[in-house]
């Protein structure tokens, strides 16, 4: 089965803010769609919080920033998925969720189309226990907090490996959209 990204209609009640095609790995068709929730999470100092991912996996070497988030579990609402992911990956409660929109992107190496729905939200300084997966424990090097424009610059201009570019361009698109909406660009 091959799915055409340009013909997909997800029938969402919110906008698709971008469609990004994988230009880094050979195209061999797509056989599944993954639905994710992702967060532009802001701390009490007005900085955006990212996961610094470092290591090696199927995609090769990685060293990139990534928004908090992940796949929806069965029968899970997209906002509930983000609340869960923030707890698991950052060890914080998130509040004030504001829907930004969705990005459709492709991952040729794993034959996947992903619909990532982005929210903006806030965390406070109170920690709660994290519950990272084994893979997250290995790949998440640290939590990085950056001012909005520094975050955008790093996402857009500091990616070395192909997978870094795939991930950071998605997150940069969401951040740029949010900052424009807020009049900060």
Model-derived segments and spans:
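Short, charged/polar surface micro-motifs in flexible loops or helix N-caps
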Residues: 42-48, 56, 73, 120-128
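Conserved Nudix-box catalytic region and its N-terminal flanking loop in Nudix hydrolases
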Residues: 47-88
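Acidic, metal-coordinating catalytic segment for phosphate/diphosphate chemistry
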Residues: 2-39, 44
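Nudix hydrolase/Nudix homology domain
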Residues: 135-185
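A short coil-to-beta-strand element that immediately follows conserved catalytic motifs
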Residues: 93-101
């Amino acid at each position: 089965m091959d799915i055409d990204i340009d013909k997909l209609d997800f029938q969402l009640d919110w906008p698709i803010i971008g469609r990004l095609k994988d230009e880094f790995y050979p195209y061999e068709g797509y056989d599944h769609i993954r639905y994710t929730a992702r967060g532009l999470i802001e701390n009490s100092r007005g900085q955006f919080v990212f996961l610094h991912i470092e290591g090696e996996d199927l995609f090769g070497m990685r060293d990139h920033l990534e928004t908090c988030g992940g796949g929806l579990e069965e029968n899970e609402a997209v906002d509930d998925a983000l609340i869960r992911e923030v707890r698991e990956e950052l060890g914080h409660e998130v509040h004030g969720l504001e829907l930004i929109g969705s990005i459709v992107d492709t991952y040729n190496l794993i034959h996947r189309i992903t619909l990532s729905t982005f929210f903006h939200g806030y965390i406070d300084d109170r920690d709660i226990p994290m519950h990272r997966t084994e893979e997250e424990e290995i790949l998440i090097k640290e939590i990085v907090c950056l001012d909005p424009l520094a975050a955008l610059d790093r996402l857009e201009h500091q990616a070395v490996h192909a997978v870094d570019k795939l991930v950071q361009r998605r997150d940069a698109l969401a951040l740029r959209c949010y900052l424009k909406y807020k009049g900060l660009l």
